[in-house]
């Protein structure tokens, strides 16, 4: 029953049954994205406007300035949004510079000349994302795929590229925003390492099926163009950009700053493909709109920390930004951080807008924005998520850590090795 008395107190915000209206507006936005995949930016902006209007009218405690900029006691969303903006634009330029270096042209020499070539490429992407940002790994992988498959990339293989970029970052505190957040919050890097057990198990599912899909759709090219010369200065610029991202991520928790310092310095050496910004802006605004909407959802608490909760959060992260989810889990405490790193990191691969890597890749391959086709052709990613999760639970078990936040509950579920 819709509540009508909304002015009395802040607690009287409208809901339909037990569901707050903000969640319904968010769900309608996601449905709109799925139905109108050629107009995703406009759908996301309409959804953002609707949620903001609702918050302004019905939520007395909402302050947009405090939400974005923050207060003396709590940081706002500005850092996440600014980093996201800088990384999506910056790595679009990086991918183009990498393509212009001609390295993708000579890669067929090092890749097997059958379906295993696509599998090796996915493995390379996964390794890259273990020490690079997953957006960079996805963009580099997508650039290579564009060349070695003559521009004909199966949507199932695109889903596999996104999955590989997220799988590699799951067990590394520098490979994904969620694991970096854990590290900053006090989670030890070794506590997330066993997420690689799940990632490797998942790779054998999405990697093999994705590579076979691609081989049937468009085999890897075997001939290498003659007279191709690698532009080593552009390779240096790519390397410089990646190093800049890693350094400023370590030192300032602001990888986008290092990316853009390196791009500007690199522009003094080689011409920078600034026109890539015009291709990436719609996808960037789309993701920033969804992240902003997600950050305004009234998620005050989660169910008790358990492997079941962590498993479900993986599916939630496919549609709900994993950054606020991770923040909430860190505040709650009591999780096995390796299990959570895998679920909230890899889970976003199941839908193209579930992770920043997927949105970045969709700027290069607009066909990935067809949500129905992505889910249908990328079915192996969801299967891989489930298989990887239970392999990790069987091999490593559920090993929760005591809450490291002051005031959090000190009791955690008993440690056990099987679900």
PLM regions with names:
Residues 1-12, 61-72, 302-303, 378-379, ...:
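Low-complexity, proline/glycine-enriched hydrophobic segments characteristic of transmembrane helices
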Residues 11-18, 35-37, 64-83, 112, ...:
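Interfacial loop-to-helix junctions that mark the boundaries of transmembrane helices
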Residues 17-22, 80-84, 110-123, 149-159, ...:
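Membrane-interfacial loop-to-helix junctions in multi-pass transporters
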Residues 19-30, 37-63, 81-93, 234-242, ...:
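Hydrophobic mid-bilayer segments of alpha-helices in multi-pass membrane transport proteins
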Residues 91-96, 124-137, 164-172, 198-210, ...:
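Helix-loop-helix module between adjacent transmembrane segments
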Residues 100-103, 151-155, 159, 171-172, ...:
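Juxtamembrane and boundary regions of transmembrane helices in multi-pass small-molecule transporters
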Residues 117-170, 181-185, 327-342, 367, ...:
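Hydrophobic transmembrane alpha-helices that form the pore/transport pathway of multi-pass ion
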Residues 238-335, 411-419:
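Transmembrane helical segments that form the transport core of multi-pass membrane transport proteins
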